[in-house]
């Protein structure tokens, strides 16, 4: 996160920024929050072939999150967001999804047991839409609750909408 007096205009360089790195991502933040509230959390995601993947795995384990189903994508970096926040509170964000987009619909078969054991499936839109849809439909078929936060904003087709029990919008 770069804190700046004002957001740079196209072609402008703002030289007054302060910078900090933090762990996160919508899915990661949801997993950590659920674990801190006492939930038994298994996090299914895809991380890249870089130091951030190892840092995140250690962080998740420290938070009590099961990491057995994290995919290691050796061909992509871990997903990253570049965030600028102006003193006014206005922000702009660029997401480089990297390994997030490696969580493909065909990989869901490997996670069927986790879905069987879950009480609720929590997802957001930083993974491929077809993966979200496949997981939601499978979870619904198994009688599981599905919570979906469509952020970043995305269109939700009728079939997916019918599989969602809780829709989080902001």
For the regions a language model picked out, list residue spans one by one:
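Residues at secondary-structure transition points
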Residues: 14, 18-29, 51, 73-77, ...
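Glycine-rich phosphate/adenosyl-contacting loop at the front of the ribokinase-like
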Residues: 1-46, 51-65
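Short aromatic/hydrophobic contact patches that present stacked aromatics
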Residues: 20, 44, 81, 120-121
């Amino acid at each position: 996160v770069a804190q700046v007096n004002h957001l740079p205009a196209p072609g402008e360089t703002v030289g007054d920024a302060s910078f900090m790195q933090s762990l996160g991502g919508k899915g990661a933040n949801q997993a950590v929050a659920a674990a801190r509230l006492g939930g038994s959390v298994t996090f299914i995601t895809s991380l890249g072939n870089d130091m951030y993947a190892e840092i995140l795995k250690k962080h998740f384990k420290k938070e009590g999150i099961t990491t057995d189903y994290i995919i290691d994508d050796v061909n992509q970096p871990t997903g990253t967001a570049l965030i600028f926040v102006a003193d006014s509170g206005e922000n702009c964000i660029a997401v480089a999804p990297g390994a997030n987009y490696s969580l493909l619909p065909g990989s869901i078969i490997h996670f069927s047991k986790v879905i069987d054991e879950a009480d609720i499936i929590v997802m957001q839109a930083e993974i491929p839409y077809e993966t979200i849809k496949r997981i939601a439909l499978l979870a619904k078929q198994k009688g599981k609750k599905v919570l979906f936060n469509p952020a970043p904003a995305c269109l939700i087709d009728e079939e997916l909408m019918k599989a969602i029990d809780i829709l989080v919008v902001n």
